[in-house]
């Protein structure tokens, strides 16, 4: 049997028996491997030992259950901790905050399924990050997880290093090089921009002080969208000076046409909608300006200090695409974060209109760009549905985006 399938069996066994005592013998019995060999494979595929991985999963499942009516002490005991105090210490050590602060501050989502057969999924432990820090003379800094302030999910590719820096890592050197070009990077001791460690590449950037934009804030004060629109335009003006040959060239229309039949079946789209999409968007696509864009302007990638905009972050996905894409993606990302709370269309419409108005204050959008906005928004959802539907861990996101696409078709 393929090694990955064997490790996937262990991953599923751990989740299915998360409240039971799981011994090293049990895991070795499932795999037929020695524990030393199993540890090596776990580190290779998941970036952690089996015991480290099990502890993290127990903590995540336990804090998820704390949204219910069962007492914290009982939940801690059910997940293998002798006392709540022991659970508390383990949780704070792993996530950098107390369980109560976590459940109060972040959405209580069930831990998603991890399937290494479907996609690369590398969990880099804080211990490994700590070992890298001497390369930057930051060995005395505390490594802390970065938590999405809207979803409560931990970042899968970055950590805070002390209070002043952010470390990012990836197996994709191209993504790392984009950030080197667009962020303020801290050089290594040998003056290199990034560190290669096995298949992973690491960089450290100076932290932007402030907080991720919270969807509740922009829903309560849609004028924030004016500020965002202005700063998207300012970012685009800066990005015009970069050589587009250094970045991927993308065509959102072609991407959607390639996925439309699949999404049509998944979302039960009408022939009328699909034909109109192909004809009207197809006739406009060549009239739209393209340039280097951010590509991932979602609330967690916008840093604010109160109402003052500080910066966009995370340029992993930057590419050459439609200029209007960033505005449309920002609007759909905000909608996605609050969609299950039955957002009022009039509020969301005000947000997207303010994004456009803010952008126009700095750089005028063309008549064709304004006309094509609904189709770019539909396109973003079509691409998201096609992507998310491939992975188990995004099952709920697939359903949400299908509902969003239908809602958008009806309203926009």
Predicted regions and their residues:
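ATP-binding pocket architecture of kinase catalytic cores
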Residues: 162-242
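Terminal helix-turn-helix DNA-binding modules in bacterial transcription factors
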Residues: 8, 12-17, 21, 25, ...
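Active-site acidic catalytic loop and adjacent metal/ATP-binding pocket
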Residues: 150-163, 167, 279-325
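Conserved NTP-binding catalytic cores of kinases and kinase-like/nucleotidyltransferase enzymes
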Residues: 118-190
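A cross-family kinase active-site recognition segment
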Residues: 215-269, 290, 320
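Sequence-specific DNA-binding recognition helix
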Residues: 23-31, 35-42, 68-103
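Active-site activation/catalytic loop segments of kinase-like enzymes and analogous catalytic loops
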Residues: 324-363, 378-394
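ATP/Mg2+ or Mg2+-diphosphate-binding catalytic cores
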Residues: 383-412
């Amino acid at each position: 049997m393929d090694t990955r399938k064997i490790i996937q069996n262990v991953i599923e066994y751990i989740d299915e028996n998360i409240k039971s005592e799981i011994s090293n013998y049990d895991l070795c019995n499932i795999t037929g491997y020695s524990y030393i060999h199993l540890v090596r494979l776990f580190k290779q595929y998941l970036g952690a030992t089996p015991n480290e991985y099990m502890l993290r999963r127990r903590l995540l499942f336990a804090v998820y259950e704390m949204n219910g009516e069962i007492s914290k002490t009982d939940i801690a005991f059910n997940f293998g901790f002798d006392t709540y105090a022991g659970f508390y210490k383990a949780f704070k050590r792993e996530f950098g905050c107390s369980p109560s602060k976590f459940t109060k501050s972040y959405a209580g989502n069930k831990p998603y399924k991890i399937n290494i057969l479907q996609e690369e999924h590398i969990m880099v432990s804080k211990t490994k990050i700590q070992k890298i820090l001497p390369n930057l003379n930051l060995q005395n800094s505390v490594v802390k997880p970065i938590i999405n302030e809207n979803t409560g999910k931990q970042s899968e590719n970055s950590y805070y290093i002390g209070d002043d820096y952010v470390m990012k890592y990836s197996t994709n050197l191209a993504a790392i090089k984009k950030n080197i070009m667009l962020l303020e990077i801290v050089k290594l001791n040998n003056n290199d921009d990034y560190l290669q460690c096995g298949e992973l590449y690491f960089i450290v950037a100076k932290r932007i002080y402030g907080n991720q934009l919270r969807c509740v804030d922009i829903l309560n004060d849609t004028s924030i969208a004016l500020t965002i629109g202005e700063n998207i335009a300012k970012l685009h003006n800066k990005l015009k000076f970069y050589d587009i040959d250094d970045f991927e060239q993308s065509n959102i229309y072609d991407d959607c046409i390639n996925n439309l039949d699949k999404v049509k079946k998944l979302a039960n789209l009408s022939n009328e909608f699909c034909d109109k999409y192909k004809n009207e968007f197809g006739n406009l696509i060549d009239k739209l300006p393209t340039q280097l864009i951010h590509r991932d302007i979602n609330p967690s990638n916008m840093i604010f200090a109160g109402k003052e905009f500080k910066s966009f972050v995370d340029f992993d996905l930057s590419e050459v695409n439609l200029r209007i894409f960033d505005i449309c993606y920002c609007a759909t990302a905000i909608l996605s974060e609050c969609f299950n709370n039955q957002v009022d269309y009039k509020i969301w419409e005000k947000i997207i209109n303010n994004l456009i108005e803010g952008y126009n204050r700095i750089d005028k959008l063309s008549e064709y760009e304004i006309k094509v906005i609904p189709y770019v928004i539909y396109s973003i959802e079509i691409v998201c549905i096609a992507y998310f539907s491939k992975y188990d861990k995004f099952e709920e996101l697939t359903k949400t985006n299908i509902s969003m696409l239908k809602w958008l078709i009806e309203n926009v």
